[in-house]
Design a protein with these regions (language model features):
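Feature captures the FAD/FMN-dependent oxidoreductase FAD-binding
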Residues: 1-60
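Rossmann-like dinucleotide-binding cores of NAD(P)H-dependent redox enzymes
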Residues: 2-21, 86, 90-110
Length: 240
């Protein structure tokens, strides 16, 4: 049990499928593979499932067609047509657990970095959700479980043509004021260090180089000579 998510002790997702298969074998469940379902027809208290290989009759039906995620495996969206024909209302089909493509030319320079942080998602200026964990930075934007957790809110907002902004905080365990005090004390103890040297050990070097560049503070300037505003600029870049 990790943060409310259940995993096999082996950390192998295939173990879940294997367990299901073994239980199906124990119960003598009949499995039809490579069989396309064309229609589900309710008849009295039963269902007739029309397939490309003939009809199957059942007392109960669970429709788990996999949306449009993997057409090569059969998840091509045809399940929606089947459900609609049975009278179900179909809501807009949107991505639910995906990475986020972001604007910005700097992502190339930090691609491949994995870093602990918090992602907050804003829709039309209001924070609608946030999640914390390992964030993966890619050539196109951001990924990782925290990003997946907020992505459905982004997909819905973008579908509704709303403005979406993802804010990353790479020191979520401290408030802005606490982090400013922490860096000020660190600068007092290491006054001759440059920003890149000063932040070494706290963050990935690719991230440090990006923050220093964005701060427009000379990368050769000793942190002991930083003004309060320059220090706060670094804090805001790291936390916002």
């Amino acid at each position: 049990n990790r943060n409310g998510y259940l995993y096999p002790n082996s950390d192998q997702a295939g173990a879940v499928l294997d367990s299901l298969r073994m239980e199906m074998e124990r119960l003598c469940v009949e499995v039809h593979t490579e069989t396309e379902v064309l229609e589900i027809i309710p008849k009295k208290n039963r269902f007739v499932i029309r397939t490309g290989n003939g009809n199957v009759t059942a007392d109960r039906v669970i429709l788990a067609a996999g949306s449009k995620a993997a057409p090569v495996t059969g998840s091509d969206g045809s399940g929606y047509a089947i459900a609609k024909k049975m009278g179900h209302r179909i809501v807009p089909v949107l991505p639910a657990l995906v990475q986020l493509k972001c604007k910005g030319k700097f992502f190339q320079s930090i691609a491949g970095v994995r870093i602990q942080g918090c992602v907050s998602l804003y829709v039309d200026g209001d924070c609608v959700c946030r999640d914390t964990g390992e964030i993966q930075l890619t050539q196109y934007g951001i990924s990782g479980i925290p990003v997946f957790q907020v992505s459905r809110f982004a997909a819905k907002a973008l579908y509704n043509k709303q403005e979406v902004t993802a804010v990353l905080n790479f020191m979520p365990q401290m408030s802005e004021e606490e982090f400013t005090v922490f860096l000020a004390e660190r600068a007092r103890l290491r006054p001759q260090k440059t920003a890149e040297e000063f932040l070494t050990g706290l963050f990935h070097k690719k991230m440090i180089a990006l923050w220093v560049k964005c701060s427009r503070i000379s990368k050769e300037k000793p942190v002991g000579t930083y003004s309060e505003e320059e220090l706060r600029t670094l804090v805001r870049l790291i936390q916002q």
